[in-house]
């Protein structure tokens, strides 16, 4: 006699509230643990946090902030190709050892044009060059601050006499001395024929000292990734993003174990063999292995665990997140390809569990959607400050460009869309730096309890399955909270 349980139920699935990590003998202090990990095959992170490619989570401000903390942000795709490329370029220009392709203005341009460029790129000075890229001067906001005639030629207001420059082999320490001695903030770098080849700024040197753990490329620029879908213009979008300096491309779909996603992955690796391609989302080891066999440099894991996702309810499909992470981690063992645990994280303890189950990094959305740097609208409700937060499968996000993520790109009539997410609001939390500090602190603490000095060590930690009573016991109980902690609020 056939049995539904025996024939069709293949496994039990567990998620964060179903388990706890078992404390182990430890010689590890939380403050000394090593958090360096891999985002993708060729990109390292100094902390295992990735901000989600969502239109209420990651644009340039968020990507800059998380990279400065040591993680990486994925710029969402709900915008034009040109705008997404511009967002990437802003991140790549935000911080540099030396700016290898500085924004310049041509001799003969106007003060108004210089001011527009400064506003667009958020910079305080621009080298002035001739048609052959010879450096002829530099114009800064100090030169323009009291200039009322915006039609005036920049040649008349720029600094050109006794212009301080340096050569390409100057290191940052020597550059800092030159800037200090001459009381200037920007140091143009020129070759033997006075062609402009770069720019070193005092602000960048200061930032490098203030944020030594920042996630940077080999040129000292902040790292950033960008999301794409599976559409007719995917390769065009990728080309623009790569040209803008994107360090990795994330092919972001609701179902990565799909013929169309794999075909796009193969095309992408053929067109951009030197760019890391991250692909998701999946929930099984078989899916992850297929993506890796076709060239994926990292795999994103999570079908339906997010706080704003309704896929499991609408489609009846998914996998409890911890089981999904473990299944994928087991399948990818020995491949050198890391996995990103995406979704379902409510507390720093969930981050520890996701990494212990096999994750190399975690993708966070709701945990940072309430920060100052998120692009969500600020809302005042009942005297409290909130920020808007929505799933990319929500009706509102799908109308703005994320239909292809759910394989509904051809649906023109809004009433015919089938959403797999909702829109809402989350409490305002302050700056990203404050939130990441608490998340990193919780992760360090968890690693200390497990005796894990590295995230790789944490992969060997043991779990205990708990009951609902165990969950209740884990939270504060039998008390009225009178003073909230910065890293805990009661589950709603």
Pin down the residues of each PLM region.
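Alpha/beta catalytic cores of nucleotide-metabolism and tRNA/nucleoside-modifying enzymes
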Residues: 1-25, 105-106, 167, 227, ...
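Bateman/CBS regulatory modules and CBS-like beta-alpha motifs in cytosolic regions of diverse proteins
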Residues: 29-45, 52-54, 83-121, 128-130, ...
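Active-site-adjacent beta->alpha loops and helix N-cap segments on the catalytic face
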Residues: 31, 80-89, 147-151, 171, ...
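Short beta-strand/loop segments at the ligand-binding rim of alpha/beta enzyme cores
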Residues: 44-51, 97-102, 161, 217-227, ...
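Catalytic cores of alpha/beta
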Residues: 61-64, 236-244, 277, 283-301, ...
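Glycine-rich phosphate-binding active-site loops on the catalytic face of alpha/beta enzymes
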Residues: 68-83, 246-258, 297-315, 345-379
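Catalytic beta/alpha-barrel core
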Residues: 74-78, 104-105, 125-127, 165-167, ...
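Short beta->alpha transition motifs characteristic of CBS
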Residues: 75-80, 123, 127, 135-150, ...
């Amino acid at each position: 006699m056939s049995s539904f349980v025996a024939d069709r139920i293949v496994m039990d699935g567990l998620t964060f509230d179903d388990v706890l990590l078992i404390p182990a003998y430890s010689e590890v202090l939380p403050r000394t643990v090593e958090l360096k990990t891999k985002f993708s095959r060729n990109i390292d992170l100094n902390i295992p946090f990735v901000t989600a490619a969502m239109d209420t989570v990651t644009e340039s401000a968020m990507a800059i902030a998380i990279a400065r903390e040591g993680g990486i942000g994925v710029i969402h795709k709900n915008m034009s190709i040109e705008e997404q490329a511009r967002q990437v370029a802003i991140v790549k220009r935000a911080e540099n050892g030396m700016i290898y392709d500085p924004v310049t203005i041509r001799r003969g341009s106007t003060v108004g044009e210089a001011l527009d460029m400064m506003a667009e790129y958020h910079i305080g000075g621009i080298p002035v060059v001739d048609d052959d890229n010879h450096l002829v001067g530099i114009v800064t906001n100090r030169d323009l601050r009291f200039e009322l005639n915006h039609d005036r030629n920049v040649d008349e207001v720029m600094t050109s006499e006794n212009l301080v420059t340096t050569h390409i082999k100057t290191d940052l320490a020597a550059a800092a001395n030159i800037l200090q001695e001459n009381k200037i903030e920007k140091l143009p770098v020129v070759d033997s024929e006075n062609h402009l080849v770069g720019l070193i700024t005092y602000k960048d040197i200061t930032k490098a000292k203030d944020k030594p753990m920042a996630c940077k490329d080999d040129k000292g620029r902040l790292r950033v990734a960008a999301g794409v879908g599976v559409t007719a213009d995917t390769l065009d979008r990728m080309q623009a993003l790569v040209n803008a300096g994107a360090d990795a491309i994330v092919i972001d779909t609701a179902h990565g174990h799909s013929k169309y996603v794999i075909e796009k992955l193969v095309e992408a690796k053929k067109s951009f063999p030197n760019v890391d391609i991250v692909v998701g989302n999946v929930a099984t080891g078989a899916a992850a292995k297929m993506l890796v066999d076709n060239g994926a440099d990292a795999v994103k894991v999570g079908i339906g665990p997010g706080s704003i996702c309704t896929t499991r309810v609408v489609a009846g499909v998914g996998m409890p997140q911890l089981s999904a992470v473990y299944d994928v981690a087991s399948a990818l063992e020995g491949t050198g390809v890391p996995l990103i645990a995406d979704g379902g994280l409510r507390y720093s303890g969930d981050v520890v569990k996701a990494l212990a189950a096999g994750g190399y990094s975690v993708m966070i959305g709701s945990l940072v959607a309430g920060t100052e740097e998120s692009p969500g609208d600020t809302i005042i409700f009942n005297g409290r400050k909130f920020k808007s937060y929505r799933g990319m499968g929500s009706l509102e996000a799908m109308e703005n460009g994320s239909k292809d993520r759910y394989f509904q790109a051809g649906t023109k009539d809004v009433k015919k869309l089938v959403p797999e997410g909702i829109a809402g609001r989350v409490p305002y939390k302050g700056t990203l730096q404050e939130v990441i500090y608490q998340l990193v602190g919780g992760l360090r603490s968890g690693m200390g309890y497990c005796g894990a000095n590295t995230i790789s060590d944490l992969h060997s930690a043991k779990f205990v399955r708990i009951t609902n009573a165990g969950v209740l016991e884990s939270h504060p109980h039998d008390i009225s909270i009178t003073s909230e902690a910065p890293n805990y609020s009661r589950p709603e």
